[in-house]
């Protein structure tokens, strides 16, 4: 068995916490960084900068350096909210240039098998935003997975009694896929072909 220094062992352990990074990839990344001290320093500084300056928007819960974020503070359509699972889903929607409203990030999807309930998501915050009376449409853009569909159905049941139009991205995005990996043209068609729930 190979023994590494305490600091290298710690680095490997931290790298393996990243999604898709196992033992071999962590080792490859660590040695790459060690071969280039300038890159290692730049990465460390960048991580500290993100930790100090990036936070969640107090309105939509997207990622921002300013609060509220630029999407909440601009003159976008204030009558429509697009609900997404994760902050990176906003990027997919924005790449399509098809949606002109505001966003709301749930930070996950309902998954009783994994212990994720409505209280674990930003659903109460969404409902509070809807109480203002200014919102006329909620576009549900959760992923087309079992969890995403369950979340969409749950939200629809909560929102419909408020007499707010509830729409869903058109099916055209493959089932079982994550929104962040869909190309801009497909997202645009899905937004334009959204349907009433």
UniProtKB/Swiss-Prot annotation:
Gene3D superfamilies: 3.30.60.80, 3.40.1360.10, 6.10.250.240, RecR Domain 1. GO terms for molecular function: DNA binding; zinc ion binding. Keywords: DNA damage, DNA recombination, DNA repair, Metal-binding, Zinc, Zinc-finger. The keyword Disulfide bond does not apply. It comes from the Bacteria. GO terms for biological process: DNA recombination; DNA repair. The keyword Lipid metabolism does not apply. SMART domains: TOPRIM. InterPro entries: DNA_Rcmb_RecR, Rcmb_RecR, Rcmb_RecR_Znf, TOPRIM_dom, TOPRIM_RecR. This is Recombination protein RecR. The lineage of its organism: Bacteria, Pseudomonadati, Thermodesulfobacteriota, Desulfuromonadia, Geobacterales. The gene is recR.
């Amino acid at each position: 068995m190979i023994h590494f220094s305490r600091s290298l062992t710690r680095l490997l352990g931290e790298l393996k916490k990243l999604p898709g990074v196992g033992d071999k990839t962590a080792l490859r990344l660590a040695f790459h960084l060690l071969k280039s001290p300038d890159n290692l320093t730049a990465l460390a500084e960048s991580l500290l900068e993100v930790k100090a300056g990036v936070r969640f928007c107090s309105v939509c819960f997207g990622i921002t350096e300013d609060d509220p974020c630029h999407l909440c503070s601009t003159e976008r359509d204030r009558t429509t909210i697009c609900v997404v699972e994760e902050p990176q889903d906003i990027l997919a929607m924005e790449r399509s240039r098809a949606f002109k409203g505001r966003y709301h990030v749930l930070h996950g999807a309902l998954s009783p098998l994994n212990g994720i309930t409505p209280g674990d998501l930003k659903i109460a915050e969404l409902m509070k935003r809807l109480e203002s009376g200014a919102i006329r449409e909620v576009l549900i853009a959760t992923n087309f997975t079992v969890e995403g569909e369950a979340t969409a159905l749950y939200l629809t049941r909560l929102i419909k009694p408020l007499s707010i139009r509830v729409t869903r991205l058109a099916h055209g995005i493959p089932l079982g896929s994550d929104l962040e990996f869909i190309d801009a043209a497909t997202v645009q068609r899905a937004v334009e072909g959204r349907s009433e729930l």
